[in-house]
Amino acid sequence: MSRYRGPRVKIIRRLGALPGLTTKTLKSKSGYINQSTSNKKVSQYRIRLEEKQKLRFHYGLTERQLLKYVRIARKAKGSTGQVLLQLLEMRLDNILFRLGMALTVPGARQLVNHRHILINNSMVDIPSYNCKPKDVITIKDRPKSQSIITKNLNSFQKSKVPNHLSFDLMQVKGLVNQMIDREWILLKINELLVVEYYSRQV
């Protein structure tokens, strides 16, 4: 299954807020009833499916990519769900998003693909690059790179930077301090339901 490129509002209308996918939010209407779920019981399969879809759309993954991460998480020590979230949060495209260098994960992916980003002074053009503690993230010293990221930073609230990261606005430099803790995950998600969804596929 390919990466979703359709209307993003359609997705958040069905799944709720997905800050990694879009900055748009839906205003709730008083008295509004979701006709697709009213007057009928929602199956456990559908509940698990929607949690999985939240994860996939928020982090901008294909179905194959997400399944690969689930398999890696199952082989690692610790809670499969929490390891899965850590793997996704430490992707370079997501780190750029959490630092405010991009307003969405798709926007961050473009920055990486267009070679605007340096890790420890080396150019990295792989959005799925696994960032590690002590990694230093900077941008190429060229006007176009500076302009794009400065514009994004001006729209970002510095208070949103999670504890496992730090950002120097003057130097436009990010630092990975440590692996992310569960409490700093931005997406509202029940990762256990995602693991259960994939239980027969891994």
Curated annotation (Swiss-Prot):
GO molecular function: rRNA binding; structural constituent of ribosome
CDD domains with a match to the protein in the record: S4
Domain S4 RNA-binding: 90-154
Pfam families, per the entry: Ribosomal_S4 (PF00163), S4 (PF01479)
Main location (coarse class): plastid
Known role: One of the primary rRNA binding proteins, it binds directly to 16S rRNA where it nucleates assembly of the body of the 30S subunit.
Recorded family membership: Belongs to the universal ribosomal protein uS4 family.
Subunit structure: Part of the 30S ribosomal subunit. Contacts protein S5. The interaction surface between S4 and S5 is involved in control of translational fidelity.
Protein name, entry field: Small ribosomal subunit protein uS4c
